């Protein structure tokens, strides 16, 4: 509008809010100092939650220490793994969000339901959005806090279909909080 000599119209964004979750990928391959530096950099850049990305099949014996160190300096921490032992360790050390839960590891959410942790519910591996329904039903039954992540696919590898999944998830669960992992883009 300024180009045409007019003032800009104030944009109304609504009542929605977001949290920025920044993932430290392949954390088991990094030193504790590297993880801490990366977490500090992400927090300084505006991240609300620091996500410790575990590596499938690679043990992470220092996971509890890493989570505890970050929580002790005031960071909110999440853990990105399906491994129930890693989830248990991270939550006991103070992680407040777990990525991810589906029918393959759902029992751990019940086991840890007394904690304040929020779970990120995802479809079963390779499954359609309908596979979220039994997971969400159980989380609701157990009174567990969760977000829904229909999974965003990379451009050229199912991106448009994944956007349609997000729209479908919003229609199915209009009041649910959602997570959109844009790192795949």
Regions found by a protein language model. Name each.
Residues 37, 44-45, 72, 92, ...:
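Residues at the C-terminal ends
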Residues 1, 50-59, 74-83, 87, ...:
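Catalytic beta/alpha-barrel core
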Residues 37-56:
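Catalytic domains of carbohydrate-active enzymes, especially glycoside hydrolases
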Residues 115-185:
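Catalytic alpha/beta core domains of metabolic enzymes, predominantly
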Residues 30-42, 83, 130-135:
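Short, acidic/polar
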Residues 3-20, 57-89, 112-119, 164-180:
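Alpha-helix-loop-beta-strand connector modules within alpha/beta enzyme cores
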Residues 16-37, 124-128, 184-185:
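Active-site mouth loops of central-metabolism enzymes
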């Amino acid at each position: 509008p300024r180009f045409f000599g007019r003032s800009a119209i104030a944009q109304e964004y609504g009542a929605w809010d977001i949290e920025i979750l920044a993932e430290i990928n392949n954390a088991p391959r990094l030193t504790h100092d590297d993880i801490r530096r990366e977490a500090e950099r992400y927090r300084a850049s505006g991240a609300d939650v620091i996500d410790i990305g575990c590596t499938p099949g690679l043990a992470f014996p220092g996971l509890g220490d890493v989570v505890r160190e970050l929580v002790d300096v005031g960071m909110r921490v999440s853990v990105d793994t399906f491994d129930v032992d890693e989830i248990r360790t991270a939550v006991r050390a103070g992680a407040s969000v777990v990525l991810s839960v589906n029918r393959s590891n759902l029992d751990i959410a019940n086991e840890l339901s007394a904690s304040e942790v929020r779970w990120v519910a995802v479809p079963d591996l390779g499954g359609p959005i309908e596979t979220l329904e039994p997971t969400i039903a159980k989380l609701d039954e157990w009174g567990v806090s969760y977000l829904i992540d229909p999974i965003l696919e990379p451009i050229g590898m199912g991106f448009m279909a994944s956007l349609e999944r997000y729209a479908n998830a919003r229609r199915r669960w209009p009041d649910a909080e959602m997570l959109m992992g844009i790192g795949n883009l």
